[in-house]
Amino acid sequence: MSNVKVAFICAHNSCRSQIAEAFGRHLASDVFQSYSAGTETKPQINQDAVRIMKELYNIDMEADGQFSKLVSDIPEPDIAISMGG
């Protein structure tokens, strides 16, 4: 696994950034470590995103331990990518 840390950042860390983290973990874990976070959190990640990722890509974000986090909750990234907002 690479030591490069990539963080996907959006407002609530409930949908876009969670999807990006999941794809990063499943498709590029040999290239970088994926994280996601937001400037605010939600009680749970978007259930439509969870369902679609599971149905279309067989990626279970909740079983993989993903949850809504603040930027201060993750390691300092080498690369931060804003997911809009």
Where are the regions that the model predicts?
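Short polar/charged helix/loop
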Residues: 1-85
